[in-house]
Amino acid sequence: MALRNAILRHLRVPVQTLGLNQSKIGFLGTIRSFSSHDDHLSREAVVDRVLDVVKSFPKVDPSKVTPEVHFQNDLGLDSLDTVEIVMAIEEEFKLEIPDKEADKIDSCSLAIEYVYNHPMSS
């Protein structure tokens, strides 16, 4: 134990604490309020971005993409293509969709609803 303490004493880096005065605290509080996630995406923004993701998929005819389109029935995509689209939607909105939920997303309308109702979509 003494050897451990001696080694740690030589390895530890001194930490300087920041002395925050009232003006700095007020400034940081302002920054925090701007960074909170209170400004949720509008439905129109979600619809536009989801449709753009689907239209940009190589196997999709962009003229067939609507908010109600079904990935397999209307666009002729297979299950792997659907997984790739859901992954692209996750990337677009910086979300991680759990597998159980991702398996249910098989149309633009379901993708739009999921993203719009997710509190962390951005």
From Swiss-Prot:
Disulfide bonds: none annotated. GO terms for cellular component: cytosol; mitochondrial matrix; mitochondrion. 4'-phosphopantetheine is transferred from CoA to a specific serine of the apo-ACP-like protein. One of its GO terms (molecular function) is acyl carrier activity. Residues 1-34 form a transit peptide. This is Acyl carrier protein 1, mitochondrial. The lineage of its organism: Eukaryota, Viridiplantae, Streptophyta, Embryophyta, Tracheophyta. Keywords: Electron transport, Fatty acid biosynthesis, Fatty acid metabolism, Lipid biosynthesis, Lipid metabolism, Mitochondrion, Phosphopantetheine, Phosphoprotein, Respiratory chain, Transit peptide, Transport. InterPro entries: ACP, ACP-like_sf, PP-bd_ACP, Ppantetheine_attach_site.
